[in-house]
């Protein structure tokens, strides 16, 4: 294919054209803050384009059973066994999607359900225009619970890394 696509449960979704400057600036700042924290730790941060292959939990992880391939804006993976030359096979521990008007519905619906079902422990939705970050965490029932919606002047604690927070003023600066 000439265009970038994501495959979600066997259904093809066109990805947005190359992200704009603001999206890239926010993504860069988030990756930078995570990378400083993750230095010399077992978890690694990756940003799009980076394939995350999510197998059907009822089937094997063989390529012919992969019906979902997504490229989250940012993902953190703490299990090195999930990493291969093609990306990540299995659920990352943490995912961030930076929404645009073209992707907001998919990120709030299809990807929300997909990441919840796949076992992504923490999911952030960043809204550049409103300067908000919505944080969901898996609860004991393996369902997402809304932790909070954070504004640009707040720090966002990273649930999977106790004691570490992202500074939103820096993320939304500029």
Tell what function each PLM region has.
Residues 1-174:
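Gly/Pro/Ser/Thr-rich low-complexity, intrinsically disordered segments predominantly at protein N-termini
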């Amino acid at each position: 294919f000439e265009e970038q696509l994501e495959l979600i449960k066997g259904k093809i979704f066109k990805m947005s054209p190359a992200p704009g400057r603001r999206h890239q600036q926010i993504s860069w700042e988030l990756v930078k803050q995570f990378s400083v924290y993750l230095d010399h730790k077992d978890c690694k941060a990756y940003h799009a384009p980076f394939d995350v292959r999510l197998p059907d939990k009822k089937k094997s992880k063989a390529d012919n059973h992969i019906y979902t391939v997504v490229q989250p804006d940012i993902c953190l993976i703490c299990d090195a066994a999930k990493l291969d030359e093609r990306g990540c096979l299995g659920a990352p521990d943490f995912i961030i999607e930076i929404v645009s008007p073209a992707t907001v519905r998919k990120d709030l619906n299809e990807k929300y359900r997909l990441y919840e079902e796949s076992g992504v422990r923490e999911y952030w939705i960043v809204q550049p225009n409103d300067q908000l970050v919505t944080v969901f965490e898996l609860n004991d029932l393996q369902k997402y619970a809304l932790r909070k919606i954070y504004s640009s002047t707040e720090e966002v604690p990273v649930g999977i890394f106790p004691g570490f927070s992202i500074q939103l003023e820096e993320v939304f600066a500029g």
